[in-house]
């Protein structure tokens, strides 16, 4: 739960912009080129634009936002994108409102409050590794907090590795003219993760408190080879094959987690 600071009387609108960004990775091993192609096809169908639209629609509901517009696209040969414009105020139906215009709050939000997702399936040309990355951004302006959707997004995708960034920008002014650069308590994104998620992941923080920048990355603690094999079972592999595949997968996970290639 997002813990607010003591209630402030504001001069006008809350102009704080809060942005939460995810890079979520699913890692897989597919032995043959045909299996790798089927993995790409599976991921492409599992996370097509329709499914992603439903996930982002759920996010909007969770954070208490109103949907203004939805744009979505499936790409050839693979990948999908969805962008949803949101506001914290109800949208006025112009037909029902007569000559009344859409409220200033809605107009103010349209360039700042949005939820987007882009997917990137890919495979290694030789070693059998296949990965799926989903980039998700939830940006809000006002009292709505994107942190409320944190746990839902992690659970909605096959999240072997999760890289998260949260930042607060701008300021809001109280009735005495004092500027406030953040309106809730936070010292880590981990504060907002559910206990069952924290128990499953190894986590690492890099935070710049004075700049209202918070970074958390995490990967699953337990390694079960069967969870990473596509159309295959570990029991059907020789010991030597299992060790080789496990080493490849663990190296891939480490490199994605640290964001760099590791030395041989």
Swiss-Prot record:
Binds 1 pyruvoyl group covalently per subunit. InterPro entries: AdoMetDC_fam_prok, S-AdoMet_deCO2ase_bac, S-AdoMet_deCO2ase_core. Heterooctamer of four alpha and four beta chains arranged as a tetramer of alpha/beta heterodimers. Pathway: Amine and polyamine biosynthesis; S-adenosylmethioninamine biosynthesis; S-adenosylmethioninamine from S-adenosyl-L-methionine: step 1/1. Its cofactor is pyruvate. Is synthesized initially as an inactive proenzyme. Formation of the active enzyme involves a self-maturation process in which the active site pyruvoyl group is generated from an internal serine residue via an autocatalytic post-translational modification. Two non-identical subunits are generated from the proenzyme in this reaction, and the pyruvate is formed at the N-terminus of the alpha chain, which is derived from the carboxyl end of the proenzyme. Catalyzes the decarboxylation of S-adenosylmethionine to S-adenosylmethioninamine (dcAdoMet), the propylamine donor required for the synthesis of the polyamines spermine and spermidine from the diamine putrescine. NCBIfam families: SAM_DCase_Eco. PANTHER family: S-ADENOSYLMETHIONINE DECARBOXYLASE PROENZYME. It is an enzyme of class 4 (lyase). The keyword S-adenosyl-L-methionine applies. Pfam families: AdoMet_dc (PF02675). The active site is at 113 (schiff-base intermediate with substrate), 118 (proton acceptor), 141 (proton donor). Its EC number is 4.1.1.50. The modification Pyruvic acid (Ser) is found at residue 113. It catalyses: S-adenosyl-L-methionine + H(+) = S-adenosyl 3-(methylsulfanyl)propylamine + CO2. GO terms for biological process: spermidine biosynthetic process. Belongs to the prokaryotic AdoMetDC family. Type 2 subfamily. Keywords: Autocatalytic cleavage, Decarboxylase, Lyase, Polyamine biosynthesis, Pyruvate, S-adenosyl-L-methionine, Schiff base, Spermidine biosynthesis, Zymogen. The record marks 112-113 as: Cleavage (non-hydrolytic). This is S-adenosylmethionine decarboxylase proenzyme. Disulfide bonds: none annotated. One of its GO terms (cellular component) is cytosol.
């Amino acid at each position: 739960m997002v813990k607010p600071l003591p209630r402030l009387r504001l001069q006008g609108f809350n102009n704080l912009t809060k942005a939460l960004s995810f890079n979520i990775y699913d890692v897989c091993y597919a032995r043959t080129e045909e299996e790798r192609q089927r993995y790409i096809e599976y991921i492409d169908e599992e996370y097509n634009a329709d499914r992603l639209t439903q996930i982002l629609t759920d996010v909007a509901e969770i954070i208490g936002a109103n949907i203004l517009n939805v744009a979505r696209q499936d790409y050839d040969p693979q990948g999908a994108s969805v962008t949803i414009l949101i506001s914290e105020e109800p949208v006025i139906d112009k037909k029902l409102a007569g000559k009344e215009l859409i409220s200033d709050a809605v107009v103010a939000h349209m360039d700042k409050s949005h939820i987007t997702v882009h997917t990137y399936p890919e495979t290694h040309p030789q070693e059998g590794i296949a990965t799926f990355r989903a980039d998700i951004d939830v940006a809000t302006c006002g009292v709505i907090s994107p942190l409320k959707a944190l746990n839902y997004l992690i659970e909605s995708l096959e999240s072997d590795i999760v890289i998260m960034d949260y930042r607060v920008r701008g300021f809001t002014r109280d009735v005495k003219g004092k500027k406030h650069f953040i309106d809730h308590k936070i010292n880590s994104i981990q504060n907002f993760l559910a206990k069952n998620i924290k128990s499953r992941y190894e986590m690492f923080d890099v935070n710049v408190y004075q700049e209202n920048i918070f970074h958390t990355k995490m990967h699953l603690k337990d390694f079960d080879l069967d969870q990473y094999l596509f159309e295959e079972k570990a029991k059907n592999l020789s010991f030597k094959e299992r060790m080789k595949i496990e080493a490849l997968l663990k190296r891939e996970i480490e490199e994605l987690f640290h964001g760099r290639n590791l030395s041989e």
